[in-house]
């Protein structure tokens, strides 16, 4: 828990420091003869963050902070295996002074989650989870070209293998 708490705090710093310059208004001079341009980034709507059971705060936190920095509100749907961690994360956002309704945490089963995925006001969907859940999201959203979908499916961590390792066991894992 201590490692994840440190990772959450570090992720906030990195996300803020790296994201703010990228989303700042940009003026581009001389884009064409006698023509200048300005790029403005605007919020697009509600972000639905479907959190994982492993690193339940760290991974969801990065997606939530990015959405908030972009001016979007967030619905956080944590894993049912990490409800307490999710509540602590929601409490941190509340303690930081975010207005009511900017971040909402909703616990639901897969049917309730799919209702949120399909809702027309939800414009960004982040899932860190399994292939089956990712396929369900794609099956329910592929016709709505206004939604941005980010799926991180079944990522694996790097393993360090020492000389005395049981290779058959290590490769199976």
Predicted regions span which residues?
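A structured beta-alpha segment of the ubiquitous adenosine-cofactor-binding alpha/beta core
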Residues: 36-37, 104-123
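Long amphipathic alpha-helix in the N-terminal Rossmann-like dinucleotide-binding domain
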Residues: 1-24
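Short beta->alpha connector loops at strand-helix junctions that form conserved
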Residues: 72, 77-79, 107, 128, ...
